[in-house]
């Protein structure tokens, strides 16, 4: 039986995917085939690191080279993809498919965006083409790609999925400044920057009392609020900021040294209470 015929039989225009038991059987069967290194098309989420192409893992490069289709997020029609820029050396002769993730828009409907993305991806796979979805940083930290993976697993159990982790901006920033993210017996909290003064103040004070290490992500437009609280809590001289890690405009310095009134979207703060 040829691979093309097998694929058509398994997908069967979506009819067989309606039965959960059949979904499970197909998924196990395809996983077994994949274990024996068949060339069935796959969907792979690839973490590409924070911005520096030299931080790409070997596994990430291998997956990109093998895929026929490279899907990557953009914020709107006129903007480039940071993730696509990182891997452009390996994607010149691929099908490069941008998908709009307008996260900053107030009318953003995540369910519609994820569903449309899944529909595009599934069509390529049903045509026998392996797809890689690029993910900036690591695939497990604030990654929109996890929503797409969830939908594919729930609605297209016959598709073989893989996830390749990448270096996060947190670990990259820590390494660039010899910053210990967490030592034996310590706790690390990774959290998106709170929008209110009271929430951020509580987070910092509780972390200080428990000597918990803080990694505050996506500071961006909230920098003025954050700066004022860092001053009030007398930790502005020891709080490490990292902006656009791995990118040409990278900045890593202590918060007291940063004089601008705003921060870019890709911004984080690392705080220890030694």
Where are each of the predicted segments found?
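A contiguous loop/helix-start segment that scaffolds small-molecule binding in enzyme catalytic cores
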Residues: 43, 205-274
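Short gly/pro/ser/thr-enriched loop/turn and capping motifs at secondary-structure boundaries
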Residues: 77-80, 104, 168-171, 189, ...
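Short, surface-exposed amphipathic charged segments that create phosphate/polyanion-binding patches used
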Residues: 109-119, 176-179, 201-207, 252-258
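Class I SAM-dependent methyltransferase SAM-binding "motif I" and its flanking Rossmann-like core
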Residues: 141-206
């Amino acid at each position: 039986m040829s691979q093309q015929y097998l694929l058509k039989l398994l997908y069967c225009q979506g009819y067989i995917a309606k039965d959960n038991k059949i979904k499970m059987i197909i998924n196990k069967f395809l996983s077994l085939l994949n274990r024996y290194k068949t060339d069935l098309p796959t969907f792979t989420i690839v973490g590409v690191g924070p911005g520096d192409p030299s931080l790409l893992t070997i596994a990430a490069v291998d997956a990109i080279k093998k895929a026929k289709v490279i899907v990557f997020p953009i914020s709107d029609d006129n903007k480039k993809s940071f993730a696509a820029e990182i891997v452009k050396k390996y994607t010149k002769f691929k099908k490069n498919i941008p998908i709009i993730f307008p996260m900053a828009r107030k009318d953003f409907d995540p369910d519609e965006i994820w569903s449309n993305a899944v529909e595009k991806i599934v069509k390529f796979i049903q045509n026998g083409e392996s797809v890689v979805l690029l993910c900036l940083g690591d695939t497990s930290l604030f990654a929109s790609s996890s929503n797409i993976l969830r939908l594919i697993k729930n609605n297209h159990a016959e598709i073989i999925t893989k996830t390749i982790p990448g270096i996060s901006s947190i670990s990259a920033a820590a390494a660039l400044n010899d910053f210990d993210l967490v030592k034996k017996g310590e706790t690390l909290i990774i959290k998106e920057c709170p929008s209110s003064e009271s929430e951020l103040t509580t987070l910092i004070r509780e972390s200080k009392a428990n000597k918990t290490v803080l990694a505050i992500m996506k500071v961006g437009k909230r920098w003025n609020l954050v700066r004022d609280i860092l001053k009030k809590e007398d930790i502005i001289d020891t709080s490490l900021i990292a902006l656009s890690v791995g990118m040409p405009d990278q900045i890593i310095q202590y918060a007291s040294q940063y004089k601008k009134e705003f921060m870019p979207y890709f911004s984080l703060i690392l705080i220890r209470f030694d």
